[in-house]
Amino acid sequence: MVNMRKVLALMQVFRERYDHKCDFNFCDIAVSIVCRSELDFINEPGLSNYAKRRRARRLGRCVRCFRVNPGFYFTKRCDGITCVPGISWNYDVEDYIKRGRVTGDRETPSTFHGYGYPVGHKT
């Protein structure tokens, strides 16, 4: 779904800058640019530490080791300060927290219940 407000705003900028030089419709170019730019921000953008903490808090995970946070009464390995990931951890959760994107064919962070990468994923 294309955001028409963005398309119209982009068309207006094109008309203001290039209308006297060109005589074609800018609609196709604007739609193409908006579609390509929205692909990068389908999930949650941002690579800052604040963005990572925000995504981890949304999932209820630790930013450093990707374990469930707050932990259970028997949790001893995650203190949120000096913890590190274990031998194997959920790579989908790591990718979402660190980069803000969902790997594979999953679309929402609420579907992080599997283990590792989806079948057919090239690493």
UniProtKB/Swiss-Prot annotation:
GO MF term (any one): DNA binding
Renumbered residue ranges of the record's region Basic: 52-55
Single GO biological process annotation from the record: symbiont-mediated suppression of host innate immune response
Superkingdom in the source lineage: Viruses
Zinc fingers (C4-type) by residue: 62-83
Keywords, alphabetical: DNA-binding, Host-virus interaction, Inhibition of host innate immune response by virus, Metal-binding, Suppressor of RNA silencing, Viral immunoevasion, Zinc, Zinc-finger
Function (record text): Suppressor of viral-induced RNA silencing. The potential mechanism of action is based on sequestering siRNAs.
Homology family: Belongs to the carlaviruses nucleic acid-binding protein family.
Name by which UniProt lists this protein: RNA silencing suppressor
Species: Poplar mosaic virus (isolate ATCC Pv275)
